A protein has these predicted regions:
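Electropositive polyanion-binding surfaces
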Residues: 1-192
């Protein structure tokens, strides 16, 4: 019931967030909606569109996009916003676990025939960035509205464990590692 298929109606929750030109979020709007996609786009097609400005976006399958120009403009705007949000998030010192994930190939009988690293391009990262923005908007709304909700709290790390971590890091050949906790500094330092 949650998968998107062209022209199929699906229940969803809308999180609409206005952003300024610097990537700062405005007041979000939340609403239950019925969503109907116009066509099937896959990550590779969207990435091809990003890599080839001026070309029309094409959908796969039997349901062509109703308005490829409108979708192309929306995707172009979304790509620009993604780049701003990614820059802002990096400046905040968040980690980007850009680790390879396996992608399996299957035979008709369901047996695995191969495995390779899955590609992670801007089309993938755009969706991830927008999901993070939606999650943050919901968390801010629940917190400022004093609505009780469950969330995960990460306690401060134990000093002895941090000392062991920094000793291990210093034993590596990696350059420019912090020697201890840094309150202000580069984004990667803030992550520690």
């Amino acid at each position: 019931l949650c998968s998107l298929a062209p022209l199929q109606k699906r229940l969803a929750m809308l999180v609409e967030i206005p952003f300024d030109s610097q990537g700062a979020p405005g007041k979000p709007r939340f609403a239950p909606i019925v969503m109907q996609s116009w066509g099937r786009l896959i990550y590779e097609d969207v990435q091809h569109f990003f890599d080839n400005p001026g070309q029309k976006i094409l959908a796969r399958g039997k349901n062509p996009l109703r308005d490829a120009d409108q979708i192309g403009k929306m995707l172009g705007d979304a790509h620009e916003l993604y780049k701003i949000l990614a820059r802002v998030r990096k400046e905040r010192g968040t980690l980007d676990f850009d680790l390879p994930e396996p992608q399996y190939s299957f035979a008709e009988d369901g047996s695995i025939t191969g495995v390779r690293n899955a590609e992670r391009n801007d089309a993938h990262k755009l969706i991830e960035e927008f999901m993070i923005a939606a999650n943050e908007a919901v968390a801010r709304h629940l917190s400022t509205s004093k609505i009780p909700f469950l969330y995960r709290v990460h306690p401060a790390p134990e000093e002895t464990r941090l000392a062991a971590l920094f000793a291990t890091l210093q034993a590596t050949a990696v350059e420019n590692l912090p020697a201890g906790i840094i309150k202000n500094g580069q984004p990667a330092e803030n992550a520690l």
